[in-house]
A protein has these predicted regions:
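Glycine-rich acyl-CoA binding loop
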Residues: 45-53
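Active-site rim helix/loop that mediates acceptor-substrate recognition in acyltransferases
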Residues: 1-11
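Aromatic/hydrophobic pocket-lining residues that form π-stacking "cages" and hydrophobic walls in ligand
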Residues: 56
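A short, internal acetyl-CoA/4′-phosphopantetheine-binding micro-motif in the GNAT/acyltransferase core
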Residues: 38-44
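Short, surface-exposed charged micro-motifs
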Residues: 2, 22-24
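A conserved beta-turn-beta hairpin within the catalytic core of GNAT-like acetyltransferases
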Residues: 27-35
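Conserved beta-hairpin
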Residues: 10-21
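C-terminal structural segments of small proteins and small subunits
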Residues: 59-94
Length: 94
């Protein structure tokens, strides 16, 4: 899965079978706030979202960002994937 950081739209995005799947974000002081997941009908499968989030975590490591999970679904991703907990800012407990 190839992920594009569309800074203009403030979202990480990918195309699957010609359909756009994205995670919207806002950015502040080396923290990225993941604010919304956009998944078209037929792509609600957790595998797609998990793969997209795994790729976003790789980008966060590369850019030395901390990740603030605003959505319950993204907080659940952190609980299921404790290897990414070091990306959480100090004081954020999941």
């Amino acid at each position: 899965m190839e992920i594009k950081d569309n800074a203009f739209s403030r979202q990480f995005e990918t195309l699957l079978d010609g359909k756009l799947i994205s995670v919207e974000y806002s950015f502040q002081e080396k923290k990225i706030f993941l604010t919304r997941i956009n998944v078209p009908d037929g792509f609600e499968n957790e595998e797609y979202i998990t793969e997209l989030l795994n790729n976003i975590m790789a980008i966060a490591y590369e850019r030395k960002f901390k990740v603030v999970p605003i959505l319950p679904k993204i907080a659940a991703f952190f609980r299921k994937n404790p290897k990414y907990r070091d990306l959480l800012p100090p004081g954020i407990k999941i």
